[in-house]
Amino acid sequence: MLQYLEPRTDVPAKDDWSTGLILQDLRWGATTLGGIAVVTGAFGVGCLFLAKTPGNVGAISVLFLVTFLFGLGPLMCWVETKALRRGLLEQPWRRVPATVAEKQDDDLHDLLLLGDGTVLKGWFEDLPDMVLERQEVFVCGPDASGRAVVRGAGFAKMENAKAGKNAETHPARERVERPLGRPLDDAATMKAYKGMRWGVRSWLWSAVPAGLGGVLVLLSLFPLAPAGLVVGGLMTALGLLGLPTAIEISRWYRDAVKAVENSAQWTPVAITLFPWKPNQNVAGLAQMPGGLALVQFVIPDLNVVANIADTGVMWIAGTHGDVIAVGVPRVPVLTFAAVQPDRDTPKEDPIPWIQRFHQPDFSGLPR
């Protein structure tokens, strides 16, 4: 059986390092994105008192759109930390035999059938396939109100659940053996690969705001709209400043996509991660097929890095030049890393500012 990230079952769940990493990442997102949402929202409200010229109206629209989108970060944190507020994470994770119920046409929820007869329902996204594969799940709860939280092996994510009834009325899905073949033969990896293909267009995240900012500036020239000039100017400046990095990231994604497409198999390699520092790339020393090499993750994924930290194994989904695609078999995650065979220590080089807004907080990784 493949080794995956698993939470510790001998300490309270909140003291498990991987659970702490999940909570830390949620708080970081809420703090960073929430702070931006508050600032843009305050400016948007202030702009409501200005003359309703095309430029000012455009600025107000942009500010409130940013407020809405970035405000989703604190909302997600509030939803996904319910288990902590309810005290469910005060108890250890329990490894419980489990399977998955067949989903009927009228079912709005996924159903997990635990070995003790408990039924847990919720929106579990990709978790059921891993539960079906390993025939187990990690659970805290249910509490007196029937609330629980679950995790699956390999996932650096918690899912809220609620206890249901009548386990005998829910037929279980049949477990099917899935040999480990080409990465793209795996449905979960294929899902992640489709997302990675969108990364090839990462340059649009800078080019589009820069272009829209330029349009807003033009609209604000006549009649003169101070808010439009300021907001449009900031959008254009930030977009142009981030464009070189965005183009470089697009190139990394393009090479990673080629690596996955040309790969005939998963390649597991041993790796030791270096202690992480804020605003630095996640890096490690890996025993690559050609020898020891420094591996630096340009866009680190929380699931991938947590699995590496727990198991000491990095799963390579393909190689293209000095770029490797890295994932976790049967988990819908893919990222990429740069391989430097001539180095054995990471260079002290801060990551570009544009990447700091979406880099997870890895300070909770075990040392």
Label for each model-derived stretch:
Residues 1-29, 133, 154-201:
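Cytosolic juxtamembrane N-terminal segments of multi-pass membrane proteins
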Residues 1-2, 245-252, 256-258, 353, ...:
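A eukaryote-biased signal for long
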Residues 7-22, 261-278, 298, 339-347:
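Cytosolic/matrix-facing juxtamembrane and C-terminal tails of multi-pass cellular membrane proteins
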Residues 88-106, 260-280:
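Structural detector for short beta-strands of small beta-barrel domains
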Residues 105-113, 278-287:
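Short aromatic-glycine-enriched beta-strand elements
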